Amino acid sequence: MIHLYKTSTPSTRNGAVDSQVKSNPRNNLIHGQHHCGKGRNARGIITAGHRGGGHKRLYRKIDFRRNEKDTSGRIVTIEYDPNRNAYICLIHYGDGEKRYILHPRGAIIGDTIVSGTEVPISMGNALPLSTDMPLGTAIHNIEITLGKGGQLARAAGAVAKLIAKEGKSATLRLPSGEVRLISKNCSATVGQVGNVGVNQKSLGRAGSKCWLGKRPVVRGVVMNPVDHPHGGGEGRAPIGRKKPTTPWGYPALGRRSRKRNKYSDSLILRRRK
């Protein structure tokens, strides 16, 4: 449930927060982390802009492998995770194990999930693509390498679709629109990642975005020449180039940035949109 603030100041006029999701992590499932997400490399040079600051965070250990096989677990809590835009669930398994997983859309407290090779095709269950999973099934948290854990479709609202099976491979349509092959032995979780409307929630003020570690975005044309190729000039000057560029001088707005001659090129049937 989205809770709108009572308007007492201009900054709370348009702000919204989820009133049903709290953050009360278990001590054995968290650990401290060095806050290195400031967009700098080892030399202190900015390599990714608009990052820095933010509130201190504790890292939640998420079970992306789902290797608690054939043991049913119950959803005990649905919690906020400051390290991702998706919610997480605390699972109590029948053998006493407690783990966090990504919250599947529609899952509520008290639901039961299980992972294995012979489990039902229902929301939140994790199973290999080689099972009787029908074509068109919505999945998330998909493995690329067997046993490494889910790496694809993990963001809030992300969902991929199983569109074909042939030989030792399965064909998936990923959230980006890319169509690629994955080994059928890799596992995936049935359903869509929760918190679908995260991109529609209004933060209400600039300070709320600063708490998330996101710095203001500034146009290059208003910078100095030392800071951006578009900078400099007298008054409102044009960028002085035929085409826009990045802060490092590379062509911007549509240039392909993927490295060439990667092994996975042979597995990609259609590039992302």
Curated annotation (Swiss-Prot):
The protein's GO terms of the molecular function aspect are: rRNA binding; structural constituent of ribosome; transferase activity
InterPro entries listed in its UniProt record:
NA-bd_OB-fold (IPR012340), Rib_uL2_dom2 (IPR014722), Ribosomal_uL2 (IPR002171), Ribosomal_uL2_bac/org-type (IPR005880), Ribosomal_uL2_C (IPR022669), Ribosomal_uL2_CS (IPR022671), Ribosomal_uL2_dom3 (IPR014726), Ribosomal_uL2_RNA-bd_dom (IPR022666)
Family (UniProt):
Belongs to the universal ribosomal protein uL2 family.
Subcellular location(s) per record:
Plastid, Chloroplast
Entry superkingdom: Eukaryota
Recorded coiled-coil stretches: none
Example of a GO biological process term: mitochondrial translation
Keywords on this record? Chloroplast, Plastid, Ribonucleoprotein, Ribosomal protein
In its UniProt entry, what is this protein called? Large ribosomal subunit protein uL2cz
User: Which source organism does the UniProt entry give?
Assistant: Liriodendron tulipifera
* A single cellular component GO annotation: chloroplast
**Assembly and interactions?**
Part of the 50S ribosomal subunit.
Q: Where is this region: Disordered?
A: 1-25, 224-273
Spell out the Polar residues composition-biased ranges: 1-14
